[in-house]
From Swiss-Prot:
Entries under InterPro entries matching the protein: ITPase-like_fam, RdgB/HAM1
Alphabetized GO MF terms: nucleoside triphosphate diphosphatase activity
Pfam families for this protein: Ham1p_like (PF01725)
Family: Belongs to the HAM1 NTPase family.
Gene Ontology CC annotations of this record: cytosol
Keywords associated with the record: Hydrolase
Protein name (Swiss-Prot/TrEMBL): Non-canonical purine NTP pyrophosphatase homolog
GO BP terms, alphabetized: nucleoside triphosphate catabolic process
Keyword Hydrolase: yes
Annotated EC: 3.6.1.-
Native species: Halalkalibacterium halodurans (strain ATCC BAA-125 / DSM 18197 / FERM 7344 / JCM 9153 / C-125) (Bacillus halodurans)
Length: 193
């Protein structure tokens, strides 16, 4: 049985990724305590996910490594906050979402388009790397930020006119799209080994 390491220290993200892979013939492992956090210096979500996976590969050379990076990109703000979604300023996700609302000001809804994006990178023990992406498009509301909802509390889905917080665990969110594609790649690889 192959060992699969989820390359994140974020418990919620680790649990979400694990749920998708638990039916596969792999032994899912969390990061070991001696593996340091990775500096996310990439210019894209794919680059950051790759950096995480490659960093863990140094400690787990025979494992399948799965890493993910995601965030919000607001068109009128030239893609901001993009790869810095969780770290463009100190504070909570709610405070960062409020800052996005502040930067958008009173722009009309036609100028408030945005996309949640996710990239999942899988590094296989044989050196193969596969990349999966997911996205949901929508608009940023006029606010206010719903307490405890972060960016999901200010994002309206294009096709549902529904706040993204309501689809956090739904099949159509950006992360689940990317993970489902990654599961397909994993199944494909497992059949060949």
């Amino acid at each position: 049985m192959h060992k699969l390491v989820i390359a994140t220290w974020n418990k919620e993200k680790r649990d979400e990724l694990s749920r998708y892979f638990q039916q596969m013939d792999v032994s899912i492992q969390s990061l070991r305590g001696d593996i340091p956090d990775v500096k996310e210096t990439g210019a894209t979500f794919i680059e950051n996910a790759r950096l995480k996976a490659e960093a863990v590969r140094q400690y787990e050379p025979t494992a399948i490594i799965v890493a993910e990076d995601s965030g919000l990109c607001v068109d009128a703000l030239d893609g901001f906050p993009n790869v810095r979604t969780a770290r463009f300023m100190e504070g909570t996700d709610d405070e960062r979402a409020a800052k996005v609302l502040q930067r958008l000001g009173d722009r009309p809804m036609s100028e408030r388009t945005a996309v949640f994006q996710s990239a999942v990178v899988i590094l296989f023990p044989d050196g193969l790397m596969r990349t999966a992406v997911g996205k949901i498009e929508g608009w940023i509301t006029y606010g206010p930020v719903k307490d405890g909802q972060g960016y999901g509390g200010i994002f309206i889905l294009c096709d549902e006119q529904l706040l993204a917080e309501n689809i956090q665990m739904a099949r159509c969110n950006h992360r689940s799209q990317a993970i489902r594609q990654a599961v397909y790649y994993m199944e494909e690889w497992l059949v060949t080994v």
